[in-house]
């Protein structure tokens, strides 16, 4: 759909889903206003696993799927605070950054003081759902939940294949920074 106020085009599609007590889908999101941003799936695309936390001396930027951001300002005591009315809070421990939503969802990021970008390690909810991230260097290699695992294969910085724990996969093709085709498990594009 097109946002009539901004003219932005938004789109999403679920390519794969593992079903269980807590489903593990793989959903792509496109946002035309984020066209110059590439989060490993081509310009303008994110997925339901695209979470980032960038921290510097003055603020923290929590990036979520669909090109959403929550900004936290650093307080004089070293804590972080979002704008008044925000549904999110950010706490810092010796080893992690912990972001909580008022609905009980918790996002845990590694704390690496030598890097602005922090790696997400897990997402959990009050009903017991937990998604755990694994990495190969700085790239997400897999996400695992109750229903199974999704594994990511890369060519350079772009994901070229997503495979679920049943063996089904999708293949993604690129022309430079642009996602040009997605082949589903049945071989259709």
Name each model feature, range by range.
Residues 1-11:
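Boundary/junction segments of secreted and surface-exposed precursor proteins
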Residues 17-29:
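Predominantly extracellular/luminal regions of secreted and cell-surface proteins
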Residues 9-19:
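Short aromatic-glycine motifs in intrinsically disordered, low-complexity regions
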Residues 50-52:
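A secondary-structure micro-motif
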Residues 1, 19-21, 140:
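Compositionally biased, low-complexity segments of secreted and virulence-associated proteins
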Residues 4, 26, 32-34, 43-45, ...:
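Extended charged/polar low-complexity repeat regions
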